[in-house]
Regions:
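Amphipathic, non-transmembrane alpha-helical scaffold segments
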Residues: 30, 34, 83, 110, ...
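Amphipathic alpha-helical packing segments from all-alpha helical-bundle domains
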Residues: 92, 119, 129-131, 139-166, ...
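Short acidic/histidine-centered micro-motifs embedded in hydrophobic/aromatic stretches
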Residues: 57, 85, 129-133, 147, ...
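Helix-turn-helix
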Residues: 36, 40, 44-85
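Hydrophobic alpha-helical segments that form the core
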Residues: 4, 169-191
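Amphipathic alpha-helical linker/stalk segments
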Residues: 82-112
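Helical hydrophobic small-molecule/effector-binding pocket
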Residues: 84, 107-132, 187-189
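N-terminal intrinsically disordered/low-complexity leader segments
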Residues: 1-32, 43, 64
């Protein structure tokens, strides 16, 4: 017989004969199970891409298809939750406020923004999921690039124009947008 420590409570449980130990799984509540599936799906899509088979994900999780579909009715629903978790949850409204701050010079804004931006987005799961999406269905990459185009790039173009002593009143040109998308592509390449 040996003494076993309950990992959840840290308390010692009754003595159990050594040969009668069986693996028991603690039943998770709904929130914990959904979080477990989502966290593992993020790792799974970062490793296998967006075309990874859900049957392999369920096998890795040790759950049935039925349970997976209880929380995420379709693969697309799961991918949308992955997008929200990996991309939307990391988006910082402070970036927009920083770029709009009239008290800072363009150089100060660029330095502060790109330092924080790269530290936030250049993670294994962010970069790999973005690249895998770009290589397959574009569902995530298109949404992320639209977010960049609508909320960041116009501000970055405005600050670049200020730095170059050019007019900041006209809409960004296609050429300017492409230039900044190329810059962001370079950042991901370095990452």
């Amino acid at each position: 017989m040996r003494l076993i420590e309950d990992r959840d409570s840290g308390l010692s449980t009754a003595e159990i004969p050594a040969g009668s130990m069986t693996s028991t799984k603690r039943r998770m509540n709904t929130t914990e199970r959904k979080r477990q599936i989502l966290d593992r799906a993020i790792q799974f899509f970062a490793q296998h891409g967006m075309d990874g088979q859900l049957r392999n994900l369920t096998k890795e999780l040790g759950v049935t298809h039925t349970l997976l579909y209880h929380y995420f009715p379709t693969k697309d629903a799961l991918i949308q939750e992955v997008y929200k978790e990996v991309f939307e949850s990391r988006w910082k409204p402070e970036w927009e406020a920083l770029l709009d701050d009239q008290t800072l010079s363009p150089e100060e804004k660029f330095n502060a923004f790109y330092l924080d931006y790269t530290n936030t987005v250049l993670t294994y799961d962010f970069v790999r999921i973005l690249i895998f999406s770009g290589l397959s269905d574009h569902s995530i990459s298109d949404r992320f690039f639209e977010l960049l185009r609508s909320r960041l790039l116009p501000r970055l173009i405005r600050e670049t124009r200020k730095y170059c002593n050019r007019s900041t009143t006209s809409k960004p040109t296609q050429r300017e947008l492409e230039f900044l998308m190329g810059l962001h592509g370079g950042i991901f390449y370095i990452g």
